[in-house]
Design a protein with these regions (language model features):
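N-terminal helix-turn-helix DNA-binding core of bacterial DNA-binding proteins
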Residues: 11-52
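Alpha-helical linker/hinge and terminal dimerization helices associated
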Residues: 16, 26, 63, 92-103
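Residue-level detection of the helix-turn-helix DNA-binding "recognition helix"
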Residues: 44-47, 57-58, 62
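Beta-hairpin "wing" of winged helix-turn-helix
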Residues: 61-76
Length: 163
């Protein structure tokens, strides 16, 4: 049976996938980070069908990831710009890109390099770290039930907790 929604899941990752889980959606967000704002530019860059692009842009606007702004008064032309919620997806895109660079590499090298705008220096690889900046390995991280966890999740997490 094909799942069409994660809306009923009490899980932050599931709720994130409700917003950006479709592969076209994340590519649209990527292009918005790269500066694309116009429907035609999204379509040309991605090679996406107009009806699919229309649906995904509408979804991203409804979810508050993009804002639809008219270009001029009285005309139908508009642009799509990232909201604060959309800009907060930058670490997700960077992490996914870094994963792709490692596990689905291009023979000629990285497809895109993210740099600090003022210096041109590459940004540091995103990785989990302590509040003091010490990098953490997977073995040093464990999930724990948060205040919004369901009773079932609290029971499940208690099985894995080392404390």
């Amino acid at each position: 049976m094909k799942r069409t929604s994660f809306a009923q899941f009490n899980c932050s990752l599931a709720q994130t996938l409700e917003v950006i889980g479709d592969w076209w959606t994340l590519m649209i967000v990527r292009d918005a980070f790269f500066g694309t704002t116009r429907f035609e530019a999204f379509q040309q860059d991605l090679g996406i069908a107009r009806n699919i692009l229309t649906q995904r842009l509408k979804h991203l606007v409804e979810q508050g990831v993009l804002e639809r702004r008219p270009l001029t008064k009285g005309r139908k032309q508009c642009e799509y710009v990232l909201t604060e919620k959309g800009r907060d997806l930058l670490p997700v895109l960077l992490a996914a890109t870094q994963w792709g660079d490692r596990w689905a590499p291009n023979r000629r090298g990285k497809r895109v390099v993210f740099v600090e705008a003022t210096t041109g220096r590459p940004i540091v690889h995103l990785a989990p770290s302590t509040a003091r900046g010490k990098p953490l390995r997977m073995e040093e991280i464990e999930p724990r039930a948060g205040p919004g966890a369901s009773p079932e999740a609290k029971a499940r997490f208690s099985l894995y907790s080392s404390s």
